[in-house]
Regions:
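Short, conserved phosphate-binding/catalytic loop or strand-edge motifs used
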Residues: 2-5, 279-280
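Conserved PLP-enzyme active-site core in the AAT-like
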Residues: 4-170, 251, 258-264
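Conserved C-terminal alpha-helix-loop-beta "cap" of PLP-dependent enzymes
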Residues: 212-280
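Active-site C-terminal subdomain of aminotransferase-like
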Residues: 130-243
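Short aromatic/hydrophobic-glycine micro-motifs
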Residues: 45, 97, 120, 211, ...
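Short, hydrophobic beta-strand segments
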Residues: 73-74, 204-207, 247-251
Length: 280
């Protein structure tokens, strides 16, 4: 559901800036780009996306002008690489556009600098890896965060903390006036799925981990990836493409990737996903 969250973030940016041009990093997950195109695009929209393994800040900047509503960047990206986004954020803001950062693996936030620290205006995340099994592809949990000044443009509703008549702490649904049963065509979102159970599982898991547990989990992921990375580098015909990564990286193989993945599965090993399967 991180893809849906990303599409909603783009829609939100368009409302805020009142612009229709969207620039998407070439290293965004191609299926996320498809969801954006399906949910957001209209005759008035101009979406710039061309899937590639090359993330170059200068090339992205060259596509940004004063007609752009937002720039969408995944970090770590589809190929597993991690990026510094401060320069991109600064230029994006200078053009009056918003920076949307997509975090496909939320556990990475236990080690990496947060999107907000790098200048993101809106953050869209996939939270499946905390408390939610794979479920044959879903449902998962889409997460979204934004700067305080944009909070009223968030889709759906917000759960707010308050006190009852006895002074006891309680929670209420606030800003629900943005939803379609009240605002109809002027609603900020028209998605009606409810991932409450997934959200609850995510919240319980995160609460049990706590701050230190979350950081430890992130570190374990990274260290395991480094161990595999170092092993693969010693094998003939294997070329690791990434200079920096969190818990995933891209490997060029001496044989067809689909064949390799199939052979590994026979040995009980999930070897990853052939890039060509998702890029075509």
């Amino acid at each position: 559901d991180g893809s849906t969250s990303t599409a909603e973030a783009v829609s939100m940016a368009k409302r805020i800036t009142k612009r229709n041009k969207v620039v998407i990093s070439p290293t965004l997950h191609p299926q996320y780009a498809e969801v954006i195109n399906t949910l957001i695009s209209s005759n008035e929209d101009e979406i710039h996306y061309e899937f590639s393994e090359n993330f170059e800040v200068e090339k992205l900047i060259s596509k940004i002008d004063d007609s752009v509503s937002c720039v969408v960047v995944q970090n770590p990206d589809f190929f597993g690489s991690c990026h510094s986004l401060e320069q991109l954020a600064e230029y994006t803001h200078s053009m009056g556009a918003l920076l949307i950062v997509v975090v496909n693996e939320i556990i990475s936030l236990g080690m990496m600098k947060s999107p907000g620290e790098m200048g993101a205006d809106i953050v869209a995340c996939e939270g499946q890896s905390l408390g939610n099994p794979l479920n044959f592809g879903g449902p998962y949990i889409g997460l979204m965060s934004t700067k305080d000044k944009y909070v009223r443009q968030l889709p759906g509703r917000i759960v707010g903390e308050t006190t009852d008549m006895n002074g006891e702490k309680g929670f209420v649904l606030t800003l629900a006036t943005r939803e379609q049963h009240i605002r109809r065509e002027k609603a900020t979102s028209n998605i009606c799925t409810n991932s409450g159970l997934c959200s609850l599982a995510f919240t319980i898991h995160l609460s049990l981990l706590g701050e230190m547990g979350f950081k430890k989990l992130s570190k374990l992921n990274h260290e395991a990836a480094i161990k595999l990375y170092n092993k693969l580098k010693t094998l003939d015909g294997f070329e690791v493409k990434n200079n920096s990564f969190f818990n995933e990286f891209t490997v060029k193989l001496p044989i067809d990737a689909s064949v390799f993945v199939e052979k590994m599965a026979e040995k009980g090993i999930l070897a990853g996903v052939p890039v060509s399967r998702l890029s075509n």
